[in-house]
From Swiss-Prot:
It comes from Canis lupus familiaris (Dog). Residues 267-414 are annotated as: Interaction with NEB. Homomer. Interacts with DST. Interacts with MTM1. Interacts with EPPK1; interaction is dependent of higher-order structure of intermediate filament. Interacts with CRYAB. Interacts with NEB (via nebulin repeats 160-164). Interacts (via rod region) with NEBL (via nebulin repeats 1-5). Interacts with ASB2; the interaction targets DES for proteasomal degradation. Interacts with PKP1. Interacts with FLII. Residues 295-411 are annotated as: Coil 2B. Residues 2-107 are annotated as: Head. This is Desmin. The keyword Transport does not apply. It is found in: Cytoplasm, Myofibril, Sarcomere, Z line; Cytoplasm; Cell membrane, Sarcolemma; Nucleus.
Length: 469
């Protein structure tokens, strides 16, 4: 690990632990820490003291560095110029000594606070080390497990699930075959149903034709009955006419007999009348016999036609009844087949839904197990990363502890130095050659303290510390 990385790691870890306030400025040497000045006040007071630290580093000649050192020691906003060999006033030296003592006192207080914070920091480091040990034990325990056994268990469960999926696939294939067979039976039954429907339509057409024939025969029978009635009426009329003619002839005969009796001289017409009567009776008997024969023949023909039509109608009715029975039986069979088909389709859908739900459940179990495996792997990787991070933090903390130990040792050695009092300051002149050779680096730290109360600035003080490197 390089020195730059150690420095940046120390600073970042310190800032994470103690925050940005306080501490050591970047770029300052280990032997010269700079502590912030904090104002002191009572708890609950509305006044506050703000400390600002300004750090300036520059390279100058010997005379310029000495002038800057003078300004830093005096702590004033301006640097008075003195000639060579000129001595400072004792009051100014006492003020400088008093300021130095105050600074040392404040540094002791701040160092005590820093020691307390450092003790808290050490306690936190111990706590982190305990957590690190616990996590290391957890990681070792996790490493000590048998991951192959878990993998074997998961593989066994996956094989069992795959076997169940194959069984369900075979069952589904068998159900598909049964469904295809049922569909074939359904198609065959549908074809048979179509044939039966066609036969039913043909029977209905034949029945309609028979009904037309029956209607025609009924109309013919009614026509014949009407004709028979008309013939009967005609026969009755002819009989009545014949009787009227006979009565007229008899009346004529009686009149002729009376005339014959009255006129004895006229020829005898009785024989002629008897002949005429005989002729008319013969003609009437002949007409009556012919009418009866014609009526009987027509009645017999109509009776035969009616019997024939009645036989056809009876046969048609019988066939219609048979067709109706067949249609009813076929309808019942079709309804039964439809019920069977519906039940089979319902069973098939239920089986498909059950198999689909079971397959989805198995897929969910597989996905869940894979997710658990992935989660365990991620958790193991996370524990390893946390362990590595804790190791890095531990190394950084060890480095910071060593650094703070060096800083504390340097601060203790600096505090134990005797306090120098300056009663007089001697200045010496340097030649340009010496000025050119006395080039060094001076570090200037400006501490500006602003006291505010209720948002208003009450007092403001500026302090400077110079250090020549």
């Amino acid at each position: 690990m390089s020195q730059a990385y150690s420095s940046s790691q120390r600073v970042s870890s310190y800032r994470r632990t103690f925050g940005g306030a306080g501490g050591f400025p970047l770029g300052s040497p280990l032997g010269s820490p700079v502590f912030p000045r904090a104002g002191f006040g009572t708890k609950g007071s509305s006044s506050s003291v703000t400390s600002r630290v300004y750090q300036v580093s520059r390279t100058s000649g010997g005379a310029g560095g000495l002038g800057a050192l003078r300004a830093g020691r005096l702590g004033t906003g301006r640097a008075p110029s003195y000639s060579a060999g000129e001595l400072l006033d004792f009051s100014l030296a006492d003020a400088v000594n008093q300021e130095f003592l105050t600074t040392r006192t404040n540094e002791k207080v701040e160092l005590q606070e820093l020691n307390d914070r450092f003790a808290n920091y050490i306690e936190k480091v111990r706590f982190l080390e305990q957590q690190n040990a616990a996590l290391a034990a957890e990681v070792n325990r996790l490493k000590g497990r048998e991951p192959t056994r878990v993998a074997e268990i998961y593989e066994e469960e996956l094989r069992e699930l795959r076997r169940q999926v194959e069984v369900l696939t075979n069952q589904r294939a068998r159900v598909d075959v049964e469904r295809d067979n049922l569909l074939d039976d359904l198609q065959r039954l549908k074809a048979k149903l179509q044939e039966e429907i066609q036969l039913k339509e043909e029977a209905e057409n034949n029945l309609a034709a028979f009904r037309a024939d029956v209607d025609a025969a009924t109309l013919a029978r009614i026509d014949l009955e009407r004709r028979i009635e008309s013939l009967n009426e005609e026969i009755a009329f002819l009989k009545k006419v014949h009787e009227e003619e006979i009565r007229e002839l008899q009346a004529q005969l009686q009149e002729q007999q009376v005339q014959v009796e009255m006129d004895m001289s006229k020829p005898d017409l009785t024989a002629a009348l008897r002949d005429i009567r005989a002729q008319y009776e013969t003609i009437a008997a002949k007409n009556i016999s012919e009418a009866e024969e014609w009526y009987k023949s027509k009645v017999s023909d109509l009776t035969q036609a009616a019997n024939k039509n009645n036989d056809a109608l009876r046969q048609a009715k019988q066939e219609m009844m048979e067709y109706r029975h067949q249609i009813q039986s076929y309808t019942c069979e079709i309804d039964a087949l439809k019920g069977t088909n519906d039940s089979l389709m319902r069973q098939m859908r239920e089986m498909e839904d059950r198999f689909a739900s079971e397959a989805s459940g198995y897929q969910d179990n597989i996905a869940r197990l894979e997710e658990e495996i992935r989660h365990l792997k991620d958790e193991m990787a996370r524990h390893l990363r946390e362990y590595q991070d804790l190791l890095n933090v531990k190394m950084a903390l060890d480095v910071e502890i060593a650094t703070y130990r060096k800083l504390l040792e340097g601060e203790e050695s600096r505090i134990n130095l005797p306090i120098q009092t300056y009663s007089a300051l001697n200045f010496r002149e340097t030649s340009p050659e010496q000025r050119g050779s006395e080039v060094h680096t001076k570090k200037t730290v400006m501490i500006k303290t602003i006291e505010t109360r209720d948002g208003e600035v009450v007092s403001e003080a500026t302090q400077q510390q110079h250090e020549v490197l």
